[in-house]
Amino acid sequence: MHRRDLLKASAALALAGIYLPRPATGATSVTRDSATRLKTLGQAQPFDYAWLKGRARTMAQQAYKAQSGELPAKVAALDWDQYQAIGYRDDHALWANDKLRFQVKFFHLGLFFKQAVQIHEVRDGMARELAYDPEMFNYGKSGLKGADLPKDLGFAGFRVNFHTDLTRDITAFLGASYFRAVGGDWQYGLSARGLAIDTGMERPEEFPMFRDFWIERPAKDSSKLVVYALLDSPSVAGAYRFEIVPGATTAMDVDVALYPRKTIERLGIGPLTSMYQYGENDRRVANDWRPEIHDSDGLAMWTGSGEWIWRPLTNPANLRFNAYADNNPRGFGLLQRDRDFAHYQDDGVFYDRRPSLWVEPKSGWGKGSVQLVEIPTADETFDNIVAFWNPEEKPQPGQELLFGYRLHWGAKMPVTPNLATVIATRTGIGGVIGQKRTYFSWRFAIDFAGGDLALLGKKVVVKPVISTSHGTVEITSARPLDAIQGYRAMFDLKVPDDVKGPVNLRLYLETDGQPLSETWLYQWSPPADRSFG
């Protein structure tokens, strides 16, 4: 797994260093299961989603408890190279010998991953906890010896392989409530989380944790895998059901039941976490030889009223928080629209292959807002972008909150506008080339393609409709651009010297009062030095 994927999890494991207690289930003897050939703990117990919701509800009625504990010294001291040296033995994968389409392998504790999770297999409605076994791992040059490790050490998480290529992951659950998946390019990128709490606020963010997992044994020849998870944190307990179908676009149906322990100021449903260092539109820290560095380049939204919105991402000098009010949103996501290798020139991590992730609500979510948090970062090892849905009403203790949504991971999204979409945003100094500038202005060039743009006749007048929260717009245009079979909209923005904070911009293309494109939103901060002459 890529270095940055682990570092992003380290941020989510701010509460690391504790073990969660294993719930009492009667006998805890270790046996080897005759079907999976893996060691199990205790007796099989009845399991279904209704039971899991009941357990989460009961937990929420009790005070949150986290028992302190320490990893074995040698495990806690593992550095990056040592942790990477720990391999999983393929012959110990869950269902390795069962001729099913899925196999599951487990992550070892260590490095950033210091909290053990309990993992169960569900077969015919009965769940049995899988036991940690040093024989599952090849410790290589890690410096660890399996015989020296506690028999109840536990796992950090798990990853799933599919029969089309059992050497590569389709999804992984690792760290707090983080999980990720690939599409047809078999490339990890951005992550999702089970829940976000108080993200982007002045006080520390709370990171709920998936403390238990139940993985349902799939039917023979089934391409669907069902995973259940129990979420816990000081503010909330929750039950999750994931129905995972891999493919060119990997789909995950997610059902969520939340039971707050206390009032939650900022609840994030369907949270997405990504990285944006710099790109065509924002080159504040573009000091690398590569032209662009990002996992995602924009936030896409399909509002309840049917409007399509594209908000390019930025790497601001200071944390930015934006909320886009909506009622029953149809979808939102962090997308990687730019898929041209030449724009990245990275043949190691292949940013041009990073999946987009679209959140599709399965029922009405009511009033609230899609919220975007952009955090300054100096390099690509830190995930600095978060997007999620925030309900208008704050969750209260004693409530049951139910949400259902589908996650789509891949290069192509399940729905796209029938209008033209933004394919690039570029910015630079304004004014007229060759003429002396007498005041500071900033130019914006937005390229649109798709929809009906390529079909427009030469006499059709296309206009950019532009609005700004501060300053004035000048030198506006919208002209055909044959290279993209679309149009380029351009304008200069002049802002008064006393405007210091961000300026909100909005633009779309129209003809005869009819929209031709999605709506482009942008937030730009004027530089402190505007002494261009």
Protein language model regions, located:
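N-terminal export signals
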Residues: 5-27
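A contiguous, surface-exposed recognition patch within enzymatic or periplasmic domains that forms
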Residues: 81, 184, 265, 269, ...
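Extended, loop-rich substrate-binding clefts of extracytoplasmic carbohydrate-active enzymes
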Residues: 189-247, 363-378, 382
